[in-house]
């Protein structure tokens, strides 16, 4: 998930016009489009909130395409939203039951792509194994925070840092267990394979099936 330096994923009204922000960092890496495409094929399904879904749908309506391919996409919402694709399904029940009872048995790599409420709930409920966070070189002052509704501290382990020529920095954190160790023993190896995801395809909270 891409965010401003001050931790916002969108403006208060949902606009993300600042996502095209870039700078010049001579020592940074250049994203490999081929690697991004290969990486996206490893994702089994996406989970998102209604605001993220509406933003993605608006991008598609303006000719930018659907960012999530033909992968199953689950939208967490209690609102009556238009279903624009056959791969989209809406859900409004208990999140823990949905993830553990329905998604984990079917999918190995489950990616929560926002927004702030969904990402925060995923962490708060102990569902996440990994958090990926792409920081753009801009401060917007106000907006929708990366994580909302957190009621406790969540200890993390920094597994990977990647800086790009555009000035974007990508961070990957493993979510630690109750004793401080990373919850996913194979996460370090996975992180190295997934280090070059570009900002257009950055995703937030990652779950893996045991």
Question: Predicted regions: what is each one?
Answer:
Residues 1-207:
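Enzymes that bind and transform nitrogen-containing heteroaromatic metabolites
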């Amino acid at each position: 998930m891409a965010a401003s330096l001050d931790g916002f994923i969108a403006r208060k009204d949902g606009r993300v016009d600042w996502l095209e922000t870039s700078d010049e960092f001579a020592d940074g890496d250049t994203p490999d489009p081929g690697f991004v495409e290969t990486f996206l094929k490893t994702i089994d399904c996406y989970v998102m909130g209604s605001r993220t879904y509406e933003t993605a749908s608006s991008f598609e309506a303006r000719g930018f395409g659907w960012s999530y391919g033909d992968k199953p996409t689950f939208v967490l919402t209690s609102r009556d939203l238009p279903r624009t694709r056959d791969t989209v399904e809406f859900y409004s029940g208990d999140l823990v039951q949905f993830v553990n009872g329905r998604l984990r048995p079917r999918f190995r790599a489950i990616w929560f792509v926002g927004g702030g409420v969904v990402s925060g709930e995923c962490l708060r409920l102990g569902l996440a194994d990994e958090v990926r966070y792409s920081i753009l070189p801009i401060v917007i002052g106000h907006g929708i925070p990366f994580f909302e509704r957190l009621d406790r501290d969540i200890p993390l382990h920094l597994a990977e840092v990647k800086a790009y020529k555009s000035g974007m920095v990508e961070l990957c954190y493993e979510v630690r267990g109750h004793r401080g160790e990373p919850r996913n023993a194979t996460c370090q190896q996975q992180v190295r394979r997934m280090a070059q995801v570009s900002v257009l395809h950055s995703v937030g909270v990652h779950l893996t099936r045991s």
